[in-house]
Regions:
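N-terminally biased helix-coil "hinge/interface" segments that flank
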Residues: 1-417
């Protein structure tokens, strides 16, 4: 009888389950906190909870994750350069560097104008060490992808970093939606690479050299190599797995399923034993894409969502934070700090117009990992990172320790790195 290992790496916890493939009977299960600084720690903790004996008979792994979804919802990911060929991008997904060059094709696939490879080369050389991936999108590239393929090859040769073309992700018309999808995919490539590398490394520690199948956002499976190239297809992977799991556990072929995790709350529908798909492309964070996935409504509200008091208003922010109960068990002095704030803090009388500027006295900062652009930090932010690595601190505490104004610490910018 085949034995399978199911792994789910979420924004808060990593879950592992051993089951008989033919019967669906669960043989063992375990949970461990997801460790974003080093994913392998959380994965290892979950597998240790399963035990070596139970793992020894596993013949395949199914991996689902909300890391891609959470990265998109929270606006995180790697630094991306965008090359637009023949038309500028009019969407709202942010990029770190962008260029628009001559080239592109018409709706019949005929070349509209020659590709300006000289401008492409100048741009690519100007972003060396400034970006981690390149997104390439040409006008009507779904009819003729030659220009996109040329730029992708140049990016890999000059920069030596991952590059992805819009036509590789979507065959649908709609330039801006295709570019948005491509940018998201580029941002997620290092995220997916880290996840697969972490899973593969921990499996080898347990003597397992077996296939890993990654759950797509539509509930089907994809290979490791495909997941590395098209990580955006794993957006809503975790919620899709939840839909299928709920159907299997309840025996219901028609259901509405609500899955609240640490970072997001997801609601999906099962009809006739299958997840209802968003064939026209799903919307993530208010942005239209060409990603075909389960039709799931995702909101940045979860068990770890940041709660802000903005004047008279209570605001749920999509960013994920460490719950105070967890922080208190991990670091000393948290409770005493909260009691001090409760006895002395004065609430804001007027709400701030820019919610990103609101940082409360009860919010302490600790590093999850080093920023991707560590070499570009100014002296104040670099010192701030050193201080909070020693113990969690508020912005005010860190500012006093450094002898600077609190406003000089770029906390919001650092959180996005």
């Amino acid at each position: 009888m085949s034995i399978g290992l199911g792994l789910d790496t979420g924004g808060t916890n990593t879950d592992a389950v051993i089951l008989e493939m033919e019967t669906g009977r669960v043989l063992a299960k375990a949970k461990s906190p997801t460790t974003h600084g080093d994913l392998s720690i959380g994965i290892r903790g979950a597998l240790q909870g399963i035990g070596r004996e139970a793992l020894s008979e596993v013949s395949l792994v199914s991996l689902s994750s909300t890391l891609a979804t959470n990265s998109v919802v929270e606006g995180r990911g790697c630094r991306v350069a965008l090359v637009c060929i023949g038309k500028d991008y009019g969407g709202t997904v942010p990029v770190d560097r962008k260029v628009v060059v001559d080239g592109g094709h018409n709706g019949h696939g005929a070349e509209e104008s020659s590709l300006d490879t000289d401008s492409v080369e100048v741009f690519l050389r100007s972003v060396v060490d400034e970006v981690d991936a390149v997104a390439v999108n040409g006008l009507f590239a779904i009819r003729n992808p030659d220009h996109e393929r040329t730029v992708k090859a140049m990016a890999r040769e000059i920069l030596g970093i991952p590059a992805v073309c819009g036509h590789e992700l979507s065959a649908s018309l709609g330039f801006n939606e295709r570019v948005s999808t491509c940018i998201m995919n580029a941002r997620l490539m290092p995220v997916m690479e880290e996840l697969i590398r972490s899973v593969r490394g921990v499996l080898s520690e347990f003597g397992l050299d077996i296939p890993i199948h990654i759950v797509r956002g539509n509930g089907s499976l994809m290979s490791e190599d495909m997941a590395r190239e098209k990580p955006v297809e794993t957006v809503l992977s975790g919620p899709s797995a939840s839909l299928i799991g709920a159907m299997t556990m309840t025996g219901r072929r028609d259901a509405v399923v609500l899955d609240m995790g640490g970072t997001t709350t997801d609601i999906g529908v099962i009809r006739d034993g299958r997840p209802r798909l968003s064939s026209e492309g799903m919307t993530i964070g208010g942005r239209r894409t060409h990603i075909v996935a389960a039709r799931i409504s995702t909101s940045g509200i979860g068990g770890d969502s940041r709660i802000l008091v903005n004047g008279p208003d209570i605001v749920l922010d999509p960013s994920r934070v460490v719950p105070m109960c967890v922080a208190s068990s991990r670091w000393s002095g948290i409770r005493e700090h909260l009691e001090s704030v409760a006895s002395t803090a004065t609430p804001l009388r007027r709400p701030s117009r820019d919610i990103s500027c609101v940082i409360l006295d009860n919010e302490l900062f600790t590093p999850v990992r080093a920023p991707m652009e560590r070499d570009k930090l100014n002296q104040t932010d670099s010192r701030f990172m050193e201080l909070i690595a020693e113990r969690p601190m508020t912005i005010t505490q860190a500012a006093v320790a450094m002898g600077v104004y609190p406003s000089s610490i770029s906390a919001t910018w650092l959180e996005g790195r």
